[in-house]
Structures are given as structure tokens and as C-alpha cells.
């Protein structure tokens, strides 16, 4: 971590804290479709940025990955640490504001599912670039974002959100080996729409 981190934006954090509290109460710990797509590709040292309740982090660590899981929600991180301890699974889980986060080292896999769209576009794109830099030669990045065409915006802080361009992730990892590139639409409340792009790309440089 690069140093003292600024307080996170409140509205998105409060939105997800409430959601996480409901999920914990309901014991709703299933992997979402994006996490299920990513999990088989993870190995070695894994950095999970915006891990939420840590369902992916916990499953990856249970399969032998060495996982560092970070999220802005102390509610989510506390529950992840509790569940990992109960299952005897070793992982690192920390609460942090990720807008200006700089990875302290490199990793075999760097994951960000459903995080970057909650930052102003400048912050989101800079973090995406730092994620790319943190992937070891031959390593993998797995990124999932909302893209243009999304009409469900209730969870966003209006001053800090970013809908990525349709192919912006692909362009950001131009020259990398694409393991998966998937555009998907999901219905949302009141007839709105969530439009996602999920990209798994491997650093072509070899160790």
C-alpha cells in the first residue's frame, strides 16, 4: 500500500454495507456468475481488489492460492476473516480505500470484479493501469466492469462513477493473450439494465 489512504466515498460504500449485512444475515455466500467464470483460472499469488464478502477469495484460497483480499467495507472484511478462520483457510483480508491503491509487489493473478465503475473515470483508469503493471510475466488479470448502456445507477455516487466503453478493457490489455472476453446484459429494478464486460487476459511475457 502506498501510504495513508483517503476516506472512501460514502454513498456507494453505504449501499454495499447494507447489501453485505443482508447477505450475511441470509448466509448468501454463493459465487456470482463472474466469480464462477474467473475461479478456474486462478493460481499462485492472487490479489483480489474489491473482494466484497470474499466468496471468490475464500474459494481460491481453499484451492491452494495465496490470496490477498481487499475491500472498502469493514463489514465484508470482518465476515470474510471470520469465515476463513472457521474453515481453517489462510488468507490476508484487509479493509482499504482502493481508489489510489498501489500494489506493493507483483502477483500471478490480479482480480477486480465489480469495483472500477465506482470510482471517477480518471481514478478507475489509473488503478486499471496499476493492476496491469502488477501482473507477473505469464500471469493473469481478471476484470469485470459495467459499461456504457447500463441504465441502473442507484448504487452510484453521482460524483464518482465510470461506465467503461464497450471495448475499453480489451483496448487497455491490447497485446495480452485473451482467455475470456464476455459482454452480458442483466435486468435490474424498474426496467433498467446492467451491462457488463468481463475480461481475462494473460501477460504474454514469459518468466
How does the language model describe each region?
Residues 125-137:
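A short glycine-rich, Lys/Arg-flanked "PGG" loop and its adjoining helix->strand segment in the class I
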Residues 102-110:
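A short acidic, Gly/Pro-enriched loop at the edge of an enzyme's catalytic core
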Residues 1-43, 52-102, 119-126, 140-207:
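Class I (Rossmann-like) S-adenosyl-L-methionine-dependent methyltransferase catalytic domain
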Residues 49:
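Conserved beta-strand/loop positions that form the S-adenosyl-L-methionine
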Residues 109-123:
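A short SAM/SAH-binding and catalytic strip from SAM-dependent methyltransferases
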